[in-house]
């Protein structure tokens, strides 16, 4: 994987990837099939954020949006990275020297929540079921396991030199 750091450059905190200062603009879309990777690439963007999901349930309690892609851990005991492969292949076809960070929604899949009802959080919202609770030790342990498996996958992926970071998201307060 690529290395990333924040360093002072001309007195300004700057993102460095593989030792090189970067223009700190990134293109992100939830809708990778309709993503305009090539358009943004031609406009000078080299940093791209791709969204992936551990779970398979609503990601927004107010409107019940589902993940816009299959959850990596939606099936118990079987990680499925095929969506990651597809979105990265699509991006690199359009932006061959792209640098990638993944926005990882760490909300648990339904099977985990069904098996761990005492680890869920009732937000008190009307008609909303209890969901994964980031304050739960069991949730954090499961998230660590899933992150470890995802990182091991990324480190061994053919595109690993394009990856420089993760943006952890999700969980329900």
Model-derived segments and their meaning:
Residues 34-130, 134, 141-142, 148-155:
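Aromatic-lined substrate-binding rim segments of carbohydrate-active enzymes
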Residues 157-159:
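Short helix-capping segments at alpha-helix termini
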Residues 22-26, 46-49, 97-103, 161-167:
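Structural preference for beta-strand elements that scaffold enzyme active sites
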Residues 16, 121-122, 168:
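Acidic surface patches and DE-rich sequence motifs
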Residues 169-173:
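Active-site-proximal loop/short-helix segments
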Residues 1-42:
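N-terminal carbohydrate-binding accessory modules
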């Amino acid at each position: 994987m690529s290395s990333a750091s924040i360093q002072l450059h001309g007195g300004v905190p700057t993102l460095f990837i593989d030792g090189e200062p970067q223009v700190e603009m990134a293109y992100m879309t939830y809708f990778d099939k309709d993503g305009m990777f090539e358009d943004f690439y031609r406009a000078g963007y080299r940093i791209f954020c791709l969204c992936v999901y551990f779970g398979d349930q609503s990601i927004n309690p107010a409107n019940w949006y589902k993940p816009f892609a299959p959850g990596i851990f939606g099936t118990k005991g079987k990680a499925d990275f095929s969506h990651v492969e597809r979105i990265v292949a699509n991006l690199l076809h359009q932006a061959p020297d792209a640098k990638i960070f993944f926005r990882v929604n760490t909300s648990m899949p339904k099977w985990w929540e069904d098996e761990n009802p005492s680890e869920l959080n009732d937000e008190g919202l009307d008609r909303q079921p209890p969901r994964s609770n980031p304050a739960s030790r069991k949730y954090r342990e499961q998230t660590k396991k899933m992150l470890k498996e995802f990182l091991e996958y990324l480190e061994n992926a053919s595109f690993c030199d394009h990856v420089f970071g993760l943006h952890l998201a999700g969980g329900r307060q």
